[in-house]
Amino acid sequence: DRRMLDVGTGTGLIALMLAQRSAAWITAVDIDVECATQAAENFAASPWADRLDAVSVAVQRYDPVEKFDLIVSNPPYYVDSLLSPDEGRNTARHAAGLPFGELAAAVVRLLSPGGRFALVLPPVEMQRFRSAALGRLYPVRWTEVCSTPRRGVRRILAEFCTTPVPAPEPARLIIELGGPDSYTEDYR
């Protein structure tokens, strides 16, 4: 059976999407107890409750019995911005609780042989992650996401493995053409 891990699950949305599209066993971890509790409630209310598990733990300390075939993360990424007085908001939005080097180390430790790691980050933060993961994780897919043809890259969707491979040719995904209801075919 395939096993998947969602790091920094928040409310569990990405884990639920994985469950909807696969028959895998999915574990979702979040350092924030309230987030993990909310994710567990959302999982229990879903048709896939028997394959979803939410755990409140920092991924750096997570020690499961088995490794994962796919690890996904849309992690907190603000590094240089001001912190909020709300500690929970800081945990959800700032990389201080999960530095990219520690994320890369956790992924390498938790990934099964031949497994993949999918990551979503803005461009500057993705470059910071790649620097932190240098020599440990290698990109196999790379998609630059733009909201419209005239706007710059807003996010990068990247997939990594632990085996050195040639760098992939970047793909570009444009979400809309600029008018109302003008989503591109690729985005739909």
Feature-to-residue mapping (PLM):
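Short beta->alpha junction loops/turns
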Residues: 32, 122-123, 180
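Conserved SAM/SAH cofactor-binding pocket of Class I
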Residues: 1-73, 79-87
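Conserved Class I SAM-dependent methyltransferase catalytic core
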Residues: 98-153
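Short, well-ordered secondary-structure micro-motifs
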Residues: 65-66, 83, 129-131, 155
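SAM/dcSAM-binding transferase cores
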Residues: 152-188
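Mobile active-site "lid"/loop adjacent to the S-adenosyl-L-methionine
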Residues: 75-102, 106-109
